[in-house]
Curated annotation (Swiss-Prot):
NCBIfam families: PRK01143.1
Organism field: Haloquadratum walsbyi (strain DSM 16790 / HBSQ001)
Family statement: Belongs to the universal ribosomal protein uL11 family.
Region (Disordered): 1-28, 138-157
Name used for this protein in its record: Large ribosomal subunit protein uL11
Gene name of the record: rpl11
Keywords assigned: Ribonucleoprotein, Ribosomal protein, RNA-binding, rRNA-binding
Superkingdom of this protein's organism: Archaea
Amino acid sequence: MAGTIEVLIPGGEANPGPPLGPELGPTPVDVQDVVQTINDETDAFDGMEVPVTVEYEDTGDFSISVGVPPTAELIKDEAGFESGSGEPQENFVANMSVDQVQKIAEQKSSDLLSYDTFNAAKEVVGTCTSLGVTIDGNNPREFKSRMEDGEYDDILK
């Protein structure tokens, strides 16, 4: 490959402007073709920030690989809110169910450092802590402690 460009793009909303356009401008690829291909491949992630890698050749040929959105984006989408809390330990912006945590853990399993769903769920809960999202009405730190005590083993293992 002649080069690689990595960017975060809102799903289905790539355009020739920043951050993609300035990166693609000096390359031999047709910018509109790249934008259209990215939009087609990321349409399912409507509005979520999605990592996209564009690899291109000197001939103008290109290939695109789409990653899984960041955990925070999946949580925002699943719980239905726009941005996290400015004071995540005091002001909570949303609540998620254990099933939603499990769903995100399974979606992200290939990108996380965890070897199983239980530990992947702990990573998701950690992100919930940073965003100010409760789980089944519990503070995420309290929920994580209950996970470690085995309360959710039947669901998350």
